[in-house]
Amino acid sequence: PKINIVTLAMIVPVTMMHMHVVQMDLKREAAREKVIEIIEKHPRMGLVRKATGITSTAELKEYAMDMGRSRSDLWENGIFEDSVSCLGKELYLFQAIHQEADVVVENIDCIRAMIGTEKDPARSVAMTNKALNFVAL
């Protein structure tokens, strides 16, 4: 599908991660609650909720460590729930990306697709997530 996505990188103090400001042009207007519901159901997106008290990427990495993640890896996009906003057909959000870890799961899925061992992307994602005991934030 053709999706017009614009991302901007910002200079902020971060620890082993980087932040994106994401702006998407949607096909139709969306409600913030519906977008959050979609994010919650996606196996590779996690919501960083205000209730966690997380205000930085360093705290997010520590949270992953507390969850028992190997090397405190964050395989999902850490989307700050309070940043999700919709304006007409535009969606905005901030996401934290652990550049050392987010590519791991995607590469595993890509290898399966390239060699043809799994044709269904959703099934490949589920297999990888299960092998890593990975449940998104």
Q: How should each PLM-predicted stretch be described?
A:
Residues 92-137:
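Generic C-terminus detector
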